[in-house]
Design a protein with these regions (language model features):
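A short beta-loop-alpha structural element at the N-terminal edge
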Residues: 6-22
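Conserved GNAT acetyl-CoA-binding A-motif
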Residues: 110-123
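Conserved acetyl-CoA binding element of GNAT-fold acetyltransferases
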Residues: 77-91, 119-120
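Conserved acetyl-CoA-binding loop-helix of GNAT-fold acetyltransferases
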Residues: 89, 95-108, 132-136
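Ligand-binding pocket scaffold of soluble enzyme catalytic domains
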Residues: 31, 41, 64-68, 87, ...
């Protein structure tokens, strides 16, 4: 399905080849990307759990985002609030309005399910552009702290990630 289309950007449903493309491109920019994440999202799409969107920029997949209408994790798990998660625009395509249009589309989809939406936000500096965009769009932290593997992190504990 196509959700948005102007002369340069198309927002559409994700397909398997997008996962291969993004895995390759993210590795080229130094990210630890695997196809597993995209396969999981597409499985969730097939099971009716999420909507996975891709932004094509002049016909090339340049970014993606996922909307879970009733997310099963995080501070608002299973409360009927949609979550926007795993948002990315490849570095070489940033500053072209792709991220804003992706988020506009994701928010519009989320609004069909509830008046409140929440975000899954990465905390390392690689997500800095997205973090700044979320603030500009008016998102406010919920105050529950940092979550890892579906649990709130305990103050002063050491957390090891991949």
């Amino acid at each position: 399905m196509v959700y948005f289309n102007n002369e340069e950007i198309i927002i559409r449903d994700m397909i398997f080849s997008d996962g291969l493309h993004f895995t390759d491109e993210e590795r080229k920019q130094g990210w630890d990307s695997t196809i597993d994440k995209f396969e999981m999202r597409l499985k969730d799409v097939k099971n009716g759990k999420c909507i996975s969107l891709v932004a094509d920029y002049y016909g090339i997949p340049a970014g993606y985002v996922n909307v879970y209408p009733d997310s099963e994790w995080g501070a608002f798990a299973n409360q009927g609030y949609p979550e926007i998660i795993d948002f990315a625009v490849l570095e070489k395509y940033r500053k072209n309005g792709i991220g804003s249009i992706l988020m506009d589309t994701a928010e519009k989809i989320a609004s069909e399910y509830a008046d409140t939406v929440y975000l899954g936000v990465g905390l390392h500096n690689g997500y800095g552009s997205a973090q700044r965009m979320y603030v500009k769009r008016g998102y406010i932290p919920d105050g529950s702290g940092v979550w890892y593997k579906d649990k709130i992190c305990t103050p002063y504990d050491t957390i090891y990630t991949n």
